């Protein structure tokens, strides 16, 4: 079962000084859908879920599901560093209308590969929604090895992996062992290389800013037009370097504020982008648009 093909946006959570900025969130959701993305991912890394209360998360899920109104799938981050909490959140967000769940590997608790299989088995068997495994070892300290995903892909409801290890060799092995499950790049700069090897698309940070471009690029790759897709990837890559010159989502929120799409407000310990790096990002955006 494929939840989407091509581009899903790892959506930011816009904040005001007093909480979640729902006016901006609604505009961002419409902006994404009107520019042809295949799905929305909320409460992920880019969405600053780690700094949000459970009540805020519940309200964001309810709002996003209603705002999307069935136009695209809404995929909700429901991971935790302990299995019991991840099961509870996955059930909760499923009951609120999530179309699928993005479940990051347990963080801080550095489990073994067999622990990963047990963890995802508990979660996937507790819900009736598709589950996407989220592998981002630079943040979690745990890496889902390709052979482990081969086992995970056989679990009922585990339908995909967001592979953000930044390693094309590992990604190629994961794709080879994934069976019927989808592999999505979690690294914007590796989208087209991954899709050339059989990945189904990307869960993208850059699409917050340029959703139509990323969507068009992934559609070209899906259609086998790799020359066009590669040309677009090479045009995008300098901008991607700027968008990750500081910890995500610091640069993307700066850029979205520059275009009037949301305020440049982050929650501690994240702080706003340095002037030196924001000046460089301004130039990269101008170059991309020229």
Which ranges hold each PLM region?
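Active-site beta->alpha loop and helix N-cap motifs at the rims of alpha/beta catalytic domains
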Residues: 2-9, 13-141, 150
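C-terminal alpha-helical cap/extension of soluble enzyme domains
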Residues: 6-14, 31, 35-37, 196-199, ...
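Alpha-helix N-capping/helix-start residues
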Residues: 17, 22, 54, 146, ...
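Alpha-helical structural signal in soluble globular domains
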Residues: 59, 63-68, 92, 96, ...
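Catalytic alpha/beta core domains of metabolic enzymes, predominantly
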Residues: 125-126, 139-244
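Glycine-rich phosphate-binding "P-loop"
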Residues: 135, 157, 267-268
């Amino acid at each position: 079962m494929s939840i989407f093909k091509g581009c899903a946006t790892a959506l930011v959570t816009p904040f005001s000084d007093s909480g979640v900025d729902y006016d901006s969130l609604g505009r961002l959701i419409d902006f994404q859908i009107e520019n042809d993305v295949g799905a929305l991912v909320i409460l992920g890394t880019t969405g600053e879920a780690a700094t949000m209360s459970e009540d805020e998360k519940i309200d964001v899920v309810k709002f996003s599901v209603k705002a999307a109104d069935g136009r695209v799938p809404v995929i909700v981050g429901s991971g935790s560093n302990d299995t019991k909490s991840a099961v509870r959140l996955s059930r909760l967000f499923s009951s609120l209308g999530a179309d699928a769940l993005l479940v990051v590997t347990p963080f801080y608790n550095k489990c073994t590969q067999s622990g990963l299989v047990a963890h995802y088995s508990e979660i996937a068997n507790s819900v009736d929604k598709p589950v996407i495994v989220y592998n981002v070892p630079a943040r979690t300290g745990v890496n889902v090895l390709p052979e482990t995903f081969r086992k995970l892909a056989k679990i009922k409801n585990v339908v995909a992996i967001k592979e953000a290890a930044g390693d094309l060799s590992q990604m190629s092995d994961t794709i080879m062992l994934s069976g019927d499950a989808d592999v999505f790049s979690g690294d914007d700069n590796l989208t087209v290389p991954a899709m050339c090897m059989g990945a189904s698309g990307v869960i993208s940070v850059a699409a917050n800013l340029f959703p139509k471009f990323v969507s068009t690029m992934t559609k070209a790759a899906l259609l086998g037009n790799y020359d066009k897709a590669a040309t677009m990837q090479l045009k995008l890559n300098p901008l991607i370097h700027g968008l990750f010159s500081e910890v995500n989502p610091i640069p993307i929120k700066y850029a979205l504020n520059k275009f009037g799409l949301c305020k440049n407000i982050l929650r501690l310990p994240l702080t706003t982008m340095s002037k030196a790096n924001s000046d460089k990002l301004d130039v990269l955006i101008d170059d991309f648009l020229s």
